[in-house]
């Protein structure tokens, strides 16, 4: 059994021992919220109605049938004003510590993905807003790499936009976004066959048994690869034993591959379809020659190095007088100057290393488990624990709601695994052990 009295230590600084009116037991408050998330109950009000008549709920809370339960508003107020994000994070970590203490946590191979949660906001109530484009977290590191690459090719350093003091500074680059007037923290989500809506995105990491190790909630219009940095940093901080990071094609970017490899770990990523125009020559027919630092086109012509741009892409260009008479020019380029340009990122070598991992036994064995791990976590959360949409508004409230839901799912999985272990020990005490059955139950 899980010792819930540890919650007293986590909330000790929020209560006064020597004065004031006796408060509701914080353990009972957390147990009621865990009941709500375990059974996918839509609200705290409905949870309290069920707890009034449910004997199992009362036994779990430590109440008899004649005792009155806390009012639902007391629980709501406590989680809105008293139990901060740090307290909820501590409860989430404490449950994971219980899982690790029981021997069920295996963070050597982890699985990363994101799922959208519909926000409590009407898509029709929106406004257009101009916001500054956020700088990339790795921009300084990329700029240093670009300058080193340009110097190696004999190119001048790129002129910084704010170097010239005589000219007014360039205004920050702006972008137009759609903002909800009901819940400004949410973002517009539209992907594949999903209906366009305001949503949040839960970027989540789990292990091979489906225990959620880390989660980060962002607006629905934030790309998975953008939120990966925060998730990965916190994951490595709490679980340095991580060795393989498995993700889908949305995470296959030069920076993510470099970040994982430089940390001494291995990315397990799938094949990513090329984003080329339909009917044009496939990308793999343009071969990079590392020795001569050039690109060979399908007609065995050389595309020489031209420059390295601000995005970190090396540009290789063909000779226009050669391309004019090329028999496949219509399928190669539509440039009016008859010049073909092929780009290659300065960190593209990390992508090629990730491709080698994809064909290795460890890459094949880990990626095939995605459907049984992280995808199963999202399916269970939405179908069994009511995470398809959130009744809360604001990034802080939704983050706390998601973490409590994943904490309840981890607790449920821990109870199932402990029951299977108890069942196995009872089975082995009466019957000759079956090795395969024992391995499956454990």
Stretches with model-predicted labels:
Residues 1-34, 39-40, 346, 350:
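Basic, short loop/linker segments at the boundary and entry of helix-turn-helix/winged-helix-like folds
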Residues 40-53, 65-442:
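Anion-binding and metal-coordination hotspots
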Residues 58-62:
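Short arginine-rich
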């Amino acid at each position: 059994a899980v010792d819930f009295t540890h919650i007293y230590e986590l909330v000790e600084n929020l209560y006064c021992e020597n004065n004031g009116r006796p408060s509701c037991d914080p353990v009972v408050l957390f147990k009621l919220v865990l009941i709500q998330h375990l059974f996918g109950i839509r609200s705290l009000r409905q949870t309290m109605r069920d707890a009034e008549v449910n004997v199992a709920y009362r036994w779990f809370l430590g109440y008899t049938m004649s005792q009155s339960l806390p009012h639902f508003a007391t629980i709501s107020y406590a989680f809105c004003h008293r139990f901060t994000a740090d307290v909820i994070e501590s409860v989430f970590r404490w449950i994971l510590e219980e899982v690790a203490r029981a021997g069920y946590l295996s963070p050597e191979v982890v699985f990363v993905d994101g799922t959208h949660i519909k926000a409590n906001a009407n898509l029709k109530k929106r406004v257009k807003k101009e916001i500054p484009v956020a700088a990339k977290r790795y921009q300084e590191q990329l700029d240093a790499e670009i300058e080193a690459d340009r110097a190696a090719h004999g190119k001048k350093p790129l002129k910084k936009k704010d170097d010239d003091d005589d000219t007014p500074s360039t205004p920050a680059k702006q972008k137009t976004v759609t903002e909800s007037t009901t819940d400004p923290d949410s973002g517009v989500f539209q992907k594949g066959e999903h209906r366009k809506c305001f949503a949040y995105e839960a970027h989540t990491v789990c292990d091979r048994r489906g225990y959620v190790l880390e989660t980060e909630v962002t607006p629905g219009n934030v790309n998975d690869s953008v939120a990966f940095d925060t998730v990965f940093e916190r994951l490595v901080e709490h679980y340095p034993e991580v060795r393989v990071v498995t993700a889908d094609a949305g995470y296959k970017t030069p920076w993510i591959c470099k970040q994982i490899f430089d940390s001494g770990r291995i990315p397990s990523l799938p094949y990513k379809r090329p984003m080329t125009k339909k009917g044009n020559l496939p990308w793999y027919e343009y071969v990079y020659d590392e020795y001569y630092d050039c690109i060979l086109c399908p007609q065995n012509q050389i595309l020489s190095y031209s420059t390295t741009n601000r995005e970190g892409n090396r540009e290789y260009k063909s000779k226009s007088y050669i391309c004019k008479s090329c028999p496949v020019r219509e399928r190669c380029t539509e440039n009016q100057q008859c010049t073909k340009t092929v780009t290659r990122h300065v960190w593209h070598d990390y992508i090629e290393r990730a491709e080698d991992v994809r064909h290795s036994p460890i890459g094949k064995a880990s990626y095939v488990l995605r459907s049984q791990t992280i995808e199963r976590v999202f399916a269970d959360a939405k179908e069994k624990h009511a995470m398809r949409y959130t009744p809360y508004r604001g990034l802080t409230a939704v983050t706390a709601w998601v973490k409590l839901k994943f904490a309840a799912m981890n607790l449920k999985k821990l109870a199932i695994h402990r029951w299977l272990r108890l069942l196995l020990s009872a089975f082995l005490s009466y019957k000759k052990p079956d090795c395969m059955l024992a391995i499956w139950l454990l």
